[in-house]
């Protein structure tokens, strides 16, 4: 019987077989954990309303004690959700990996901004939320600390040379994120 439930949400264009999210979903399932790793609608041309509907369906199925892991544009999706959490169980922990900037030149990204979320919204949505990002992420040149960490009062773990923390940056298997999933909120994926 699974002891935890995990919801893994991909970003723009999804996460293919070589992505750390796909690897992580397999590792957690192999341990007998409950994992939902949905394909969000139209990942190449995402629309916030459609992605929110898909997230709402996932959250309606998930039990209390959910651990959520978001990559890239899914981080922004989660933050939109944090503004309106009525009727949904509070996530236990949330990890936002490589959130993009509104200036990122990705199709559909502009439709996810502006983002008007407050620290209290994030606190209501999850017991703990933290960010993992890199200073050299081409999709967040301003830096996740400046755009998200400071305004939302969230801890940002910096991955040196991590780029967008995807396969292009060497993030297929990522044991540190698996450790975060199975450990406490203090254990952090930094490499």
Question: Where do the PLM segments sit?
Answer:
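Active-site catalytic motif of lipid deacylating hydrolases and related acyltransferases
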Residues: 2-64
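Active-site nucleophile loop of the alpha/beta-hydrolase fold
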Residues: 11, 40-43, 94-104, 134
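Acidic catalytic loop of the alpha/beta-hydrolase fold
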Residues: 15, 135-140
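Catalytic histidine neighborhood in serine/cysteine hydrolases
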Residues: 33-36, 150-166
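Catalytic histidine-centered segment of alpha/beta-hydrolase-like enzymes
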Residues: 46-48, 162-174
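Gly/Ala-rich beta-loop-alpha elbow adjacent to hydrolase catalytic centers
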Residues: 68-79
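Conserved alpha/beta-hydrolase "acid-adjacent" motif
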Residues: 105, 138-144
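Short beta-strand/loop motif that positions the catalytic acidic residue
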Residues: 125-126, 130-133, 137
């Amino acid at each position: 019987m699974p002891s935890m439930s995990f919801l893994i949400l991909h970003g723009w264009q999804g996460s293919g077989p070589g992505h750390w999210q796909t690897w992580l979903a397999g590792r957690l399932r192999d341990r007998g954990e409950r994992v939902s790793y949905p394909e969000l609608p139209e990942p190449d041309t995402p629309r916030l309303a459609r992605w929110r509907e898909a997230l709402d369906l996932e959250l309606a199925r998930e039990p209390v004690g959910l651990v959520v892991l978001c990559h890239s544009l899914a981080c922004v999706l989660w933050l939109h959700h944090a503004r309106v959490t009525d009727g949904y169980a509070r996530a236990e922990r949330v990890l936002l990996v490589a959130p993009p900037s509104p200036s990122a030149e990705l199709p559909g990204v502009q439709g996810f901004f502006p983002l008007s979320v407050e620290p209290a919204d994030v606190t209501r949505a999850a017991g703990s939320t933290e960010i993992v990002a890199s200073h050299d992420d081409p999709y967040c040149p301003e830096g996740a600390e400046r755009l998200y960490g400071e305004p939302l009062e969230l801890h940002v773990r910096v991955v040196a040379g991590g780029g967008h923390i995807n396969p292009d940056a060497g993030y297929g298997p990522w044991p540190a994120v698996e450790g975060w999933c199975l450990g406490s909120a203090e254990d952090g994926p930094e490499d």
